Every structure is written in structure tokens, then in C-alpha cells.
A protein has these predicted regions:
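General beta-strand structural signal in soluble alpha/beta enzymes
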Residues: 2, 9, 19-23, 42-43, ...
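Secondary-structure junction/capping motif
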Residues: 2-3, 159
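Active-site phosphate/pyrophosphate-handling residues
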Residues: 3-6, 128
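Short, flexible micro-motifs
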Residues: 6-9, 156
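Short, glycine-/small-residue-rich phosphate/pyrophosphate-handling segment
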Residues: 13-29
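Active-site loops and adjacent core secondary-structure elements that bind or stabilize anionic groups
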Residues: 27-33, 37-171
Length: 171
């Protein structure tokens, strides 16, 4: 049986001579490319489409692998595959000279930024540490202050203002 991902991979590996569309969102780009090049496509364009095709098939294969891996309860497979969808590019990575991005395995954006500058990787790391710690506190009764993913101030107090001040003083 040859179909689906096998056909996409076959076309993508022949990008020198083949245009592979793996997503309907690529139709417009193909139309522009064909109009720009009098009915032809250039190699750089075909390479970009091949890369996207391999990304799609790899993502698909990773989902299948993870399904069977979870079903067999294999905690430590010889090889492991992590996949996710881009949530956003961060202001920078762990250090200001690095690039960073946040990916989600469940396709949900779980954090909504209300104001301020774009978050960095470290900001997200601190957020997830704070969420993890706050889950251990009594509901609506505590504050945790986080620096570099480490708790540096914690207070349990039903009065939110007092709890914040106590946590800040314990830093």
C-alpha cells in the first residue's frame, strides 16, 4: 500500500524535479511562483516545499510512534521523538544572543499575555515553575516568587496582599 505519507515523502525527496504541496495554504504561494517564473518554479522554492513536506510527515510519524509508545507503557525507548506545534517565537532564548520559541504538544496556547514586552524563554521557564509550585499550595492562599525557575520567596496566607509581602520579605 503506497499512499499518504509515502507519496508525500517520495515527491519531497525528488524536489529537484517535483513540486510537493503538503498543505492547502501553499496553493497561493505556488500560484505566485508560477506567475513570477512563467509557469516554472525555482529550486529554492521546491526545497522550501520539500522541507515543509518532510516536517508534516515527521510530525505525523511522531504522533503514531508516541501513541504506540504510550500504549506499550515504554518509559525509556531506545530512541524518542518529541513533537509540538509552534505557539510563538520568544524575544530571545536562554541568553539574549540566542533565538528561542515555545511549542505545545496539545495544540493549546495555555498562557495569554495581557501586557508588557514579548516574553523570553526564561520568562516562560519561570511561569511554568511558578505554576508547578502554586499547584502544591492551598487554593487561593499563597504566593510564590520565582527567579531563574527557582522559588526564592513563598508565603501561604489567605490575604493576598499579606501573602505577597511575606513572600517578598522571605526572598
Amino acid at each position: 500500500d503506497i499512499g499518504g505519507p509515502t507519496m508525500v515523502r517520495s515527491a519531497a525527496k525528488n524536489y529537484n524535479d517535483v513540486v510537493i504541496l503538503s498543505n492547502t495554504k501553499q496553493y497561493e504561494d505556488l500560484t505566485i511562483e508560477l506567475n513570477k517564473n512563467k509557469g516554472s518554479t525555482n529550486l529554492k522554492f521546491r526545497e522550501k516545499l520539500a522541507e515543509e513536506a518532510f516536517m508534516e510527515t515527521a510530525y505525523y510519524e511522531s504522533k503514531i510512534f508516541n501513541y504506540f509508545n504510550q500504549k506499550s507503557k515504554n518509559l525509556f525507548p531506545i530512541k524518542n521523538v518529541f513533537s509540538g506545534k509552534l505557539v510563538e517565537k520568544t524575544r530571545y532564548g536562554e541568553n539574549p544572543h540566542q533565538k528561542g520559541a515555545i511549542y505545545s504538544q496539545n495544540n493549546k496556547q495555555e498562557i495569554i499575555q495581557i501586557s508588557g514586552k514579548q516574553l523570553s524563554y526564561n520568562n516562560y521557564n519561570d511561569l511554568y515553575s511558578a505554576l508547578s509550585i502554586s499547584k502544591t499550595l492551598p487554593k487561593n492562599k499563597g504566593v510564590a516568587i520565582i527567579k531563574h525557575a527557582n522559588p526564592c520567596g513563598v508565603s501561604i496566607n489567605p490575604n493576598k496582599i499579606k501573602s505577597f509581602k511575606e513572600a517578598l520579605e522571605s526572598d
